[in-house]
A protein has these predicted regions:
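Conserved small-residue packing positions in alpha-helical repeats and bundles
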Residues: 46, 84, 101, 135, ...
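Structural motif corresponding to the intra-repeat A-B loop/turn of tetratricopeptide repeats
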Residues: 52, 90, 107, 141, ...
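Alpha-helical repeat scaffolds
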Residues: 61-64, 92-101, 111-120, 144-155, ...
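Residue at a conserved register position within TPR or TPR-like alpha-solenoid repeats
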Residues: 49, 87, 104, 138, ...
Length: 382
């Protein structure tokens, strides 16, 4: 199921085939202004030779015009324009190679586009934009492995958003789920755009066998990344928090949904009242809960109490960190979960480096590792 969601994300990134152009290239014979006959004669000969595809001879006549003494600025301009024109027609020189590259792409001669890359390199015209077009040519030829290989060899992990979208699309066509996930994570890390976060979190949510707690974490991240927009999502997040004993968090979520004008009506009122009532009850028995957690043979209760304290919001994060640390020292039955809780509390307290280190230590259970990895990406990008 996970691969299907990632693959669905990949299909959303269409590959364009718009025409490309090379700026500043003369594609017509340059008009000859007033020049001396010593300059005009070899240029006229060059024009005739170029018309018959005798490009080497034509360039030789341009060189003859350049050799005329005391050239005026206007004469130099006409000579330069003629040379550019011949280079474009012949596909030689820097401008000519660029023109050939553009013409080959626009004519859908994608194999020639790939071969043009070496000519561009030799003439100093192979830039990031050209390499992206070459990678796209591989894709349009159906050579998806070649496309991915070209991107890795020429961009590594340094490609821009469009390059990474192309990499993801190639991975999709190659049935390479791991590369698709990596490309999507890179898009998230590079752009921090909600649309990519939504795809990544939906992919994680489709993992089989997630616990309610792990699903709660995914919805927490959806809220933090601005990818919750529907009432059902707000309600599910609040209900999961309430179900797992985090009433203060549930109350805060509902209030955010109301403020965003997404939640309203009797159902919202009932859910908010329930959360407020439970949060009040939890606060009233907090001292007893702490005593029971300290008396417990393991650190689970302290970790959970710390998570609930975190859910109470700004001003409570230092206490949450302390409680979770005590739970870790005592020994929780699920150390990965405790490390994730500590990382979230660290992040909320503004201690991003400690948060990332804590997330990275949660590497035991495979599903917990997914959740920890998502939190680590979030901490690095926010």
């Amino acid at each position: 199921m996970l691969s299907k969601v990632i693959r669905a994300a990949a299909t959303a990134f269409a590959i364009g085939t718009a025409a490309i152009a090379v700026a500043g290239i003369a594609l017509t014979v340059p008009a000859q202004a007033a020049v001396r006959s010593a300059v005009g004669k070899p240029l006229n000969e060059a024009k005739s030779l170029a018309a018959s595809s005798s490009y080497s001879a034509a360039l030789a006549r341009v060189s003859a015009a350049e050799a005329v003494p005391n050239l005026t600025p206007e004469e130099r301009s006409v000579i330069s324009a003629m040379r550019q024109y011949i280079e474009v027609k012949s596909g030689t020189g820097s401008l000519g190679v660029k023109a050939k590259f553009a013409n080959d792409y626009n004519a859908k001669r994608y194999r020639d586009v790939i071969n043009d890359g070496e000519l561009l390199r030799k003439n100093g015209g192979l830039d990031a934009s050209s390499m992206q077009i070459i990678a796209q040519a591989y894709y349009l030829l159906g050579d998806y492995h070649g496309c991915s290989r070209y991107i890795m060899n020429n961009f590594g992990n340094g490609g821009g958003e469009e390059v990474m979208k192309l990499q993801m699309r190639c991975a999709y066509e190659s049935q390479d789920n791991e590369s698709m996930r990596t490309a999507l994570e890179t898009l998230v890390a590079r752009t921090n755009k909600p649309e990519y976060w939504s795809q990544l979190l939906n992919a994680a949510q489709s993992t089989k066998g997630l616990s309610d707690h792990q699903t709660l974490d995914i919805y927490r991240l959806k809220l933090l990344t601005g990818t919750i927009t529907k009432a059902d999502d707000y309600n599910l997040l609040a209900q999961l928090a309430l179900q797992l004993g985090f009433a203060a968090e549930a109350q805060a979520v509902i209030e955010k949904g109301i403020a965003a004008k997404v939640l309203s009506g009797d159902r919202t009122t009932r859910l908010l009242t329930m959360a407020q009532k439970q949060a009040g009850a939890n606060a009233a028995k907090s001292a007893a809960a702490l005593a029971a957690a300290n008396a417990s043979p393991n650190g689970d209760a302290l970790v959970k109490l710390g998570e609930d304290t975190w859910g109470q919001g700004q001003g409570h994060y230092p206490d949450a960190i302390k409680l979770i640390q005590q739970g870790l020292q005592k020994g929780p039955t699920d150390k990965d979960n405790a490390l994730i809780r500590l990382g979230v509390a660290y992040y909320s307290a503004g201690q991003k480096d400690q948060a990332v280190r804590s997330f990275e230590k949660a590497d035991g259970d495979a599903k917990q590792k997914i959740i920890a990895h998502l939190w680590a990406i979030f901490a690095r990008t926010h």
